[in-house]
Curated annotation (Swiss-Prot):
It comes from Psychrobacter sp. (strain PRwf-1). This is tRNA 5-methylaminomethyl-2-thiouridine biosynthesis bifunctional protein MnmC. Residues 330-739 are annotated as: FAD-dependent cmnm(5)s(2)U34 oxidoreductase. It catalyses: 5-aminomethyl-2-thiouridine(34) in tRNA + S-adenosyl-L-methionine = 5-methylaminomethyl-2-thiouridine(34) in tRNA + S-adenosyl-L-homocysteine + H(+). Residues 1-282 are annotated as: tRNA (mnm(5)s(2)U34)-methyltransferase. Its EC number is 2.1.1.61, 1.5.-.-. It holds the Pfam family Methyltransf_30. Keywords: Cytoplasm, FAD, Flavoprotein, Methyltransferase, Multifunctional enzyme, Oxidoreductase, S-adenosyl-L-methionine, Transferase, tRNA processing. It is found in: Cytoplasm.
Length: 739
């Protein structure tokens, strides 16, 4: 994929004194010189009837399973359309809650009501494409005047700027709010839409676009954004009733929309513009003409076969999870935690189940290093390490609002001893993501003045994750409850299997944290070692290498023993050790434990600690601490940093080593192709899995859990089809013999 080229801008003032960016590449303004914000509201919000559609969506939320609304935009530009849409969404939501509370005489506040009814709250999903994105500085400048013009936009603008991604090709998921998601696809629009549509086609059921914003530069300036190939993808991603709006009334736009099956209508344009176009996707109808050679040709008709479409939609969506379903997640490591979080954020009640406790397995290290394994820039859009890293560091920063920090931005220096890129390939990356430091800078930032650090990769956005703080955050979610239970067997039951069951409670013992749905909706039985049987609608298996014992269709992972070591340095050692995380053939990192960390590991809060790891022993399930693997971790560090030999010897005796060095052993689950399993295990969509992440769980799991939740709820996923195929539970590469 081509490298993203940022927009080249000049600036001018509009009639209201606002600073307006002008594209030097296309020779066109980004929005009207009359009033860009109101142009966005008129052309795209009003003409797509979003105020009425949002109101209807929220009005249904209290009486039925909530719906999602999806908008696709061609031309992100300055983000003004997104901001106006998001602002309207929040206004519609507040209007609904104000009305609902007044009608029901609720004594709680709107915010309390929102928390209590989250399972019925609709969600807004916006997908936008941009070939030449603005730099962060240019975006900030372009939006500054709108913050002054409409102060109610300030929090929306600030949040967008805080989440605005590094300009790397591919899809960047931004969680603007709990119920508002923006997938920003950077790169060629036709390619991005094709990737989106291909991902849609690979799933057993999929989402659709409800409204289109066709907001590229004028056809005379940018023909490629109005090409036939673009409208082919618009057709693939739309359904009958999908609307579209565009400022342009050019013939190429009319013809493209009509070819995509839309009925077009001219309406008054904004400001001095005489007219614009709106459009509605029609129902395809197969018609037979006995007098012609075109028997069975497809035409489009606004009023016919709507009943047929409804029937087809039931078939497509029959296995999709609805917002108020009860879901069990088995396994409370990082995969289970992230699966529970993503599903709970979508309104589902989630029971997180583990035979021991959260973080009892390989995910429970004192700290996890978030630093990607790099790839040449041309491959980055389909490289799971890279796109997961970009999403995860945003995710951890965004949810890090508690007393104890989840993510500490430390930066990381990679010594390129096990790297897929060299310094020349690193130079192609934006400096915000990766760069190479001079020898003096590398020495200064690491504190290693005698070490040869000429070959290096500096990762400015990387840092350390505190697993305990993350687990605590997840477990405070109002839609998540934890249950200790050892699940031994899973029995899926179709609804008709309950016809002979007169009383579900007679055969199922249910604990307080699992709510039994009506019999017709209960589809999965979880059989515990204790004899207790739990009833849920869906189950996600996230039990690492034990996942296969719960469902034989899950790949039997390669089992990798890993031992992480840590110790409390002396004052002399602390002065000599690196001051930031390093990657070499292993990795090391200084950190300071937080209060509460001692509940999971042998650490002392507030005392500087140094960790290093990790061993890598295949097909070994022993979880006892080994002195030999302390030595392995120690030797990896000294091989990379020989100058530390004098100040960091291993303790002389085994007793001293056991006393001064601590460790944790985890058994990691790995696939032959090093990609995790994400998706449905069965054809009915009752049993799912998120597993097999090896040592990359804290990097992969946040994004992969988003993908899983999107698949389960029939929404668009933020991955290209080629990468999605690499995560398939039943992919052909899993047939390769393990070694």
């Amino acid at each position: 994929m081509d490298k993203v080229t940022p927009a080249k801008l000049s600036w001018r003032e509009d009639e209201l004194g606002n600073v307006v960016p002008v594209s030097e590449i296309f020779g066109d303004v980004y929005y009207s010189l009359v009033d860009g914000l109101n142009e966005s509201r008129y052309v795209f919000l009003t003409q797509n009837k979003l105020p009425e559609r949002f109101e209807a969506l929220f009005s249904r939320a209290n009486s039925s399973a909530a719906s999602n609304f999806s908008i696709a935009e061609l031309g992100f530009g300055t983000g003004l359309n997104i901001l106006a849409t998001w602002q309207l969404w929040e206004h519609s939501k507040q209007q609904f809650h104000t009305y609902f509370n007044s009608q029901t005489n609720l004594q709680t506040s709107s915010q309390d009501h929102l928390k209590g009814s989250r399972s019925l709250t609709p969600r807004l999903h916006i997908i936008s494409t941009e070939k030449h994105p603005l730099t962060h500085a240019d975006l900030s400048r372009s939006l500054e005047s709108w913050k002054h013009k409409d102060t109610s936009l300030v929090p929306f603008v600030d949040q967008l700027l805080a989440l605005y991604p590094t300009l790397i090709s591919g899809c960047h998921r931004l969680q603007l709010a709990e119920d508002v998601t923006l997938d920003l696809w950077l790169g060629d629009a036709c390619f991005s839409l094709q990737q989106l549509a291909n991902s849609y086609d690979t799933l057993p059921y999929g989402a659709h676009i409800d409204a289109w914003y066709l907001d590229g530069f004028a056809p005379a300036c940018n023909e490629s954004l109005w090409a036939d190939q673009i409208f082919e993808q618009v057709k693939r991603l739309s359904k009958p009733g999908t609307t579209a709006a565009t400022f342009s009334s050019a013939g190429v736009v009319k013809r493209g929309l009509m070819a995509a099956g839309f009925e077009i209508k001219k309406t008054k344009g904004f400001g001095r513009k005489r007219e614009m176009l709106t459009a509605t996707k029609l129902e395809p109808v197969a018609v037979s003409d006995d007098t012609s050679d075109n028997q069975g040709a497809t035409e489009y008709d606004a009023k016919s076969t709507l009943a047929l479409r409804s029937k087809e939609q039931v078939t497509l969506d029959t296995h999709a999870v609805t917002p108020n379903e009860q879901i069990a997640v088995i396994g409370a490591g990082v995969c289970g935690l992230m699966a529970a979080w993503s599903l709970a954020q979508r309104g589902n009640a989630v029971s997180l189940i583990d035979k021991e406790a959260p973080l009892a397995g390989a995910s429970g290290n004192p700290r996890a290093l978030l630093a990607p394994k790099m790839t040449p820039l041309a491959h980055v859009a389909e490289h799971l390490h890279s796109i997961s890293y970009l999403y995860s560091q945003r995710f951890y920063r965004q949810i890090d609002q508690g007393e104890h920090k989840i993510f500490t931005p430390t930066t990381t220096l990679d010594l390129l001893q096990k790297s897929n890129v060299d310094v020349h390939q690193i130079a192609e990356y934006p400096e915000q993501m990766a760069t190479t430091l001079s020898l003096d800078s590398a020495r200064d930032i690491s504190g290693l003045q005698q070490q040869d650090l000429t070959a290096n990769l500096y990762l400015p956005q990387s840092g350390l994750i505190n697993p305990k703080a993350l687990a605590d955050k997840v477990l405070t979610h109002p839609n998540i409850s934890f249950k200790q239970a050892n699940i031994k067997r899973i029995t899926p039951l179709q609804a008709e299997a309950f016809d002979d069951v007169t009383e579900v409670s007679e055969v199922i013992e249910v604990t307080a944290d699992i709510t039994v749905q009506p019999a017709k909706r209960t589809k999965v039985m979880l059989h515990c070692e204790s004899g207790e049987v739990l009833s849920v609608n869906r189950v996600v298996i996230a039990a690492a290498f034990e996942s296969q014992s719960l469902d034989a269709r899950i790949f039997e992972f390669r089992k990798i023993r890993g031992q992480l070591s840590w110790f409390e340095p002396t004052t002399e050692q602390l002065q000599a050790l690196p001051t930031l995380p390093l990657k070499y053939s292993g990795y090391c990192a200084p950190f300071i434990p937080q209060p509460g960390d001692e509940a999971v590991n042998s650490v002392t809060p507030s005392v500087p600690t140094f960790l290093l790891g990790a061993s890598f022993i295949r097909n070994d399930l022993d979880d006892e601490i080994r002195l030999s693997e302390h030595a392995i971790n120690h030797q990896k560090l000294l091989t990379a940093l020989p100058e530390l030999s004098a100040v960091l010897p291993l303790p002389d005796t085994e007793a001293d080593l056991y006393q001064r060095w601590q460790a944790r052993v985890g058994i990691r689950s790995q696939t032959p192709d090093y990609h995790p399993l994400v998706g449905a295990v069965d054809e009915q969509g009752l049993i799912w899995t998120l597993s097999g992440m090896g040592s990359k769980g804290y990097a992969f799991a946040p994004l992969c859990a988003q993908v899983l939740a999107d698949m389960m709820t029939a929404q668009f996923v933020p991955l290209p089809a080629a990468l999605l195929a690499k995560l398939s539970v039943h992919r052909s590469s899993l047939k390769k013999p393990l070694s």
